[in-house]
């Protein structure tokens, strides 16, 4: 590990010189590339330097204890040695985590698709609750939200809703949300007070660039139709809604919330590219899953990942057996505690697999 860290530090020093070179600065494309590489290496190099400083302090304290006869100095050296030795193991763990292969999608924006599943109107209402939860979470992290497509029920819920969250590290934190979310609560229409169970499915897709997914225009069928509101009521007198079908895979995306046909087509293609990219990722994850059993990070859409129990005010994540009793705050976007726990388990699994 130390040899690898030395190489990374040398690379970091080299990049530090390059980004200050006037000739490199003049070539903005190359300069931006070096700036990103430098920024990516900085956390691990800073942590390595802190680790080296701690090891140096330990060495100095041991030398004092071997050579010094003054009791006061020896006592200070003992205290320093104990303090520094306590830091070694935690620093080594932090360095191991920083050395883990980085998910190339982690810094990307995300497209989130939520669909009401089993449970009719209750499932649609829960899909609306999840949409609000992720919207509030994005606000807490000062990320931007852009609605891409929505099919509402007219009673406060969604059959399905797609939206983009833009912000640094959005995918790194939200990628663990893909799967089936289950809700247990008493519907307002339930006179007998019985608890009903409903589900909604969440898909979190990294936004992709055109260079990452190429779509042959001949593989697309594009239909235009009139936008409609609740119950089929027309909300637009022009054929501005767009349905894009990817013929080879059968993927269908409809968008009608944009102000123009062009905008709806752009949104639909954006979602389609993200879905196709996500399918390719899923195939890769299958290969990885065959090598190691993973609790989190598989992103399997059919996997029941979490239960929201309203009578008990609890949220239980079934992948890591974590239960929190703060349902109201959680649905208001206070979900970092759960996400941090999922990240920790994921990192631990990856370290074990190395």
Curated annotation (Swiss-Prot):
PROSITE patterns associated with the record: RF_PROK_I (PS00745)
SUPFAM superfamilies according to UniProt: Release factor
Transmembrane portions of the chain: none
Keywords, in A-Z order: Cytoplasm, Methylation, Protein biosynthesis
UniProt superkingdom: Bacteria
N5-methylglutamine: residues carrying this PTM: 233
InterPro entries attached to this UniProt entry: PCRF, Pep_chain_release_fac_I, Pep_chain_release_fac_I_sf, Prokaryotic/Mito_RF, RF-1
Post-translational modification: Methylated by PrmC. Methylation increases the termination efficiency of RF1.
Subcellular location per the Swiss-Prot or TrEMBL entry: Cytoplasm
GO MF terms, alphabetically ordered: translation release factor activity, codon specific
Principal location: cytoplasm
One Gene Ontology term, aspect cellular component: cytoplasm
Pfam families (alphabetical): PCRF (PF03462), RF-1 (PF00472)
Protein function: Peptide chain release factor 1 directs the termination of translation in response to the peptide chain termination codons UAG and UAA.
Similarity section: Belongs to the prokaryotic/mitochondrial release factor family.
Database matches in HAMAP family: Rel_fac_1
Protein name per the record: Peptide chain release factor 1
Species, as recorded: Clostridioides difficile (strain 630) (Peptoclostridium difficile)
Lineage: Bacteria, Bacillati, Bacillota, Clostridia, Peptostreptococcales
